[in-house]
């Protein structure tokens, strides 16, 4: 499900396609996910975020967390390019499709983004950035990354992702080396 969300979004993928990919009958879907496709999407989002949190925690334990983050950003650029600029972040893809009426889905996405910011903040703290700055910078990193990813998908080119990643890392390294700045 998360791959379908990354490529085509919630409204771009049908229940029949999901059932076909999973090789299961419709009754199984509605037995485990009585809320249908929305409930399944929320479960997929939670699963993706959990995997990302585990990955970010592993990056934070590296001897150089910022270099590990830099390597991960390069890998994300390569993955996007390899997918033909189709495989973006499933959270962003679904978020762009929501309306004000999608309160349950929007709440789940809000929690998912908050979890990612928390994990990024923990990584930045491990890199030697003060907790208050790490929290604010995690918001910047996630927001800039998602925006650059969106632009790269639209343009079919990684240039904006590369520029954004480079500048983010420059800012983070400056913070790491200059940990005397006032909190935001």
What are these regions (language model features)?
Residues 1-5, 145:
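Short hydrophobic clusters on alpha-helical segments that form packing/core surfaces
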Residues 4-39, 43:
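Helix-turn-helix
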Residues 57-87, 138-141:
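Hydrophobic alpha-helical connector segments
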Residues 67-71, 82-107:
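Amphipathic alpha-helical segments used for helix-helix packing
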Residues 79-82, 122, 142-159, 171-177:
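Amphipathic C-terminal alpha-helical segment
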Residues 92, 132-151, 163, 167-170:
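Hydrophobic alpha-helical segments that form the core
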Residues 101-103, 113-137, 174-181:
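Hydrophobic alpha-helical bundle segments that form small-molecule/ligand-binding pockets
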